[in-house]
Amino acid sequence: MFLGSHAPRLDDKGRLTLPAKFRDELEGGLVITKGQERCLYVFPMAEFTRISESLRTVPVTAKALRDYSRVFFSSAADDVPDRQGRITVPAPLRSYAGLMRDCVVNGANTRIEIWDAQRWQAYLESQEESFAELSEEVLPGVI
């Protein structure tokens, strides 16, 4: 499980150092792809495989699935962190997420999200008021 928020910097080669506590789950490889709200999703290879298999069960005649799958899979790149825990974020994905230098890496349960630091701050500020309301809708009786 991935938890917490971290603030690494993207280097000149497009590499990002992942938090040490995330590395064990990713040593078998990972997939990075477009996420929602212009962030990037990073999945351990096993989790990405599980998602892929789940999507395979939906009929290809479902237009929404075709549309989503085209973007999700065509933008995906696999990688293995190096000895320093760095991954290379491909240029098209850096562009999509607006990643320049300062980033935020968030644990999001079964995935990691990579955000441009300013975009993440703006997102947090826009969601602060609705956070309590959303918990009642999304997590009734859980918390």
From Swiss-Prot:
Annotated InterPro entries: MraZ, MraZ_C, MraZ_dom, MraZ_N, MraZ_sf, SpoVT-AbrB_dom, SpoVT-AbrB_sf
Record note on quaternary structure: Forms oligomers.
Family: Belongs to the MraZ family.
Gene name tied to this protein: mraZ
Keyword Transcription regulation: yes
GO molecular function: DNA-binding transcription factor activity; transcription cis-regulatory region binding
Pfam families linked: MraZ
Subcellular location: Cytoplasm, Nucleoid
Residue ranges occupied by any SpoVT-AbrB domain in the UniProt entry: 5-47, 76-119
NCBIfam families hit by this protein: division/cell wall cluster transcriptional repressor MraZ
Protein known as: Transcriptional regulator MraZ
HAMAP family, per the entry: MraZ
Gene Ontology biological process terms, A to Z: negative regulation of DNA-templated transcription initiation
PROSITE patterns hit by this protein: SPOVT_ABRB
One Gene Ontology term, aspect cellular component: nucleoid
Keywords for this protein: Cytoplasm, DNA-binding, Repeat, Transcription, Transcription regulation
